[in-house]
């Protein structure tokens, strides 16, 4: 039996400080979040997603020349291996899109002859590849399920605009043709890009700590992000709102869920207790999208659910609550909300993988045994 006492056991590692990181800082006491020292709301209003990606990797915002070189390198990887295209088309259309994303990353690893290289430059090369190709995987998966032709990437466009173009085309009704829609979508990517030692990032760091490869770390992170208690929550939020349908029924739905002790997705956070610092920025984008796309119904439902939850529990929304209806207004299928999260979070995951490799210590916690005491094996005929 271990020497730990019951009070030493922290289920879910709640409150445990597992390591140092310079990538981001979550400050629940002031309801704030910084990436490399910059307030996330400042980055959302003043930077592109690519600038934030660069910042998370290098610790500083890029100069104009550095950003141009970063974009040129990333966009040079916007082509998919023929085998990967064939693999995606061979997968069941009923498969969860997160499983398609995970499978795509695993396949990419099999094609990289230097996959086990752990130096930071190789990790960043893989990050560039994922940044370029995962939006293509997502767009291809959406369109193949609908029986639509695949749209090729455009190397002149940003990550956000290119993704919207590949999913929805470039017609006048496409969000890719509306700069305001592109910008609000880009802001969501910035908000989802990084959040310290969350479950998926910690999973990536655990895998990295064993000196495994970056593709294994990313596939493990995708698996963790798929869960409804982590990234999958934004899908559950929208499924709930679609099921409620009528804003006037939202408060009753919340009260009924609480009466039956059901978990209400989109509310509460393991770290933030006074509200998620990313919500104001995401809510602003959600309201702007609603104003442009006849989404007043979803704003009313959002407000009614939020107010009912606050009145009963005092629990505040997290980022997934406004992000869900925002992605719905853009036109994304609900099951693809979490894969969008993947595309954004690749920035944070790869920054943490580099950080873990550069100052590595195997992550191997202890456990407190609470099973049977030592016993002797009885012959099978006497059991």
Swiss-Prot record:
Keywords: Transferase, Tricarboxylic acid cycle. GO terms for biological process: carbohydrate metabolic process; propionate metabolic process, methylcitrate cycle; tricarboxylic acid cycle. It is an enzyme of class 2 (transferase). Its EC number is 2.3.3.5, 2.3.3.16. The active site is at 230, 269, 320. The keyword Transferase applies. Gene3D superfamilies: Citrate Synthase, domain 1, Cytochrome P450-Terp, domain 2. CoA binds at residues 263-267. It catalyses: propanoyl-CoA + oxaloacetate + H2O = (2S,3S)-2-methylcitrate + CoA + H(+); oxaloacetate + acetyl-CoA + H2O = citrate + CoA + H(+). It comes from the Bacteria. One of its GO terms (cellular component) is cytosol. Pathway: Organic acid metabolism; propanoate degradation; Carbohydrate metabolism; tricarboxylic acid cycle; isocitrate from oxaloacetate: step 1/2. Belongs to the citrate synthase family. Homodimer. This is 2-methylcitrate synthase 2. It comes from Corynebacterium glutamicum (strain ATCC 13032 / DSM 20300 / JCM 1318 / BCRC 11384 / CCUG 27702 / LMG 3730 / NBRC 12168 / NCIMB 10025 / NRRL B-2784 / 534). The gene is prpC2.
């Amino acid at each position: 039996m271990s020497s730990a006492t019951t009070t030493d056991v922290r289920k879910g590692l709640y409150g445990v400080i597992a390591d140092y990181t310079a990538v981001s800082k979550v400050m629940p006491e002031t309801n704030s979040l910084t990436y490399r020292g910059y307030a996330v709301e400042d980055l959302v209003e003043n930077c592109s997603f690519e600038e934030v990606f660069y910042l998370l990797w290098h610790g500083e915002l890029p100069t104009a020349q550095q950003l141009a070189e970063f974009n040129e390198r990333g966009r040079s990887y916007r082509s998919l291996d023929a085998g990967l295209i064939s693999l995606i088309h061979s997968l069941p259309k009923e498969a969860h899109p997160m499983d398609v994303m995970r499978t795509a990353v695993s396949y990419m690893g099999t094609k990289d002859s230097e996959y086990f290289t752990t130096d930071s430059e190789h990790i960043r090369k893989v990050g560039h590849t994922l940044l370029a190709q995962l939006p293509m995987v997502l767009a291809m998966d959406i369109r193949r399920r609908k029986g639509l032709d695949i749209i090729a990437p455009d190397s002149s466009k940003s990550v956000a605009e290119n993704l919207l173009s590949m999913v929805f085309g470039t017609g006048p009704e496409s969000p890719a043709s509306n700069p305001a829609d592109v910008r609000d979508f880009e802001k969501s990517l910035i908000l989802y890009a990084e959040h310290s030692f969350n479950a998926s990032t910690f999973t990536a760091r655990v895998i990295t700590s064993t000196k495994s490869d970056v593709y294994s770390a990313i596939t493990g992170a995708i698996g963790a992000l798929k869960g409804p208690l982590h990234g999958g929550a934004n899908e559950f939020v929208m499924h709930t709102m679609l099921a409620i349908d009528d804003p006037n029924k939202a408060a009753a739905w919340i009260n009924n869920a609480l009466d039956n002790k059901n978990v209400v997705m989109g509310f509460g956070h393991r770290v933030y207790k006074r509200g998620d610092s990313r919500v104001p920025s995401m809510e602003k984008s959600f309201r702007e999208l609603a104003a442009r796309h006849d989404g007043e119904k979803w704003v009313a439902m959002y407000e009614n659910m939020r107010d009912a939850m606050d009145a009963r529990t005092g629990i505040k929304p997290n980022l997934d609550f406004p992000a869900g209806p925002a992605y719905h207004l853009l036109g994304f299928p609900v099951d693809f909300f979490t894969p969008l999260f993947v595309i954004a979070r690749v920035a944070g995951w790869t920054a943490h993988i580099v950080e873990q490799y550069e100052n590595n210590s195997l992550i191997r916690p202890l456990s407190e045994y609470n099973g049977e005491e030592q016993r002797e094996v009885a012959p099978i005929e006497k059991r």
